[in-house]
Amino acid sequence: MRFAFSEDQLAFRDAVRDLVAKVAPPATLRAVWDGRRGYDPRAWSHLAEMGVPGLLAPEAAGGLGLTEVDLVLIMEECGRAALPGPLVEHAAVAVPTLAGGSGDSLTAWLQAAASGEILVSAGLDGPAA
C-alpha cells in the first residue's frame, strides 16, 4: 500500500501555496481580520478559479471530483497562510452535503457552490443552537 502523495496532488498543493502567497499577503490578511466580512472575496475568487470550492463535488456537477486527502492538502496550505475564509464549512461540509442529495434544485445549488459562485455554510437550529 502506498502512503505518499501523488505528483498531481503535490503540484496542486504547490499551486495553491503560490496563489495564496500572491493574493493574501500579511497586510491583506490583517485587513480581513480587522474587517467585518470574515473572508477576502478576491482570494476566494482566485481559489474558485482553481476549483477549490468544488474539490469534493463530482465532475458531473462542475466539481473536481477529488478526495478528502486532496482537500486536506489544500486546507493545510490555506491554514499555513492563516487565510480567513469559508473553506472548511463550504468545501468540506456544505458541498459534500449537497452532493449527497438529489433533485433539480439541489443540483443547481451544488453547481453554484462547486464553482464558488455562491458561499454555502452549515447552521445550527434548535434550543441548544
Task: For the regions a language model picked out, list residue spans one by one.
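Intrinsic disorder at enzyme termini
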Residues: 1-8
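Conserved S/T- and glycine-rich ATP-binding loop of Class I adenylate-forming
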Residues: 9, 20
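Glycine-rich flavin
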Residues: 21, 26-129
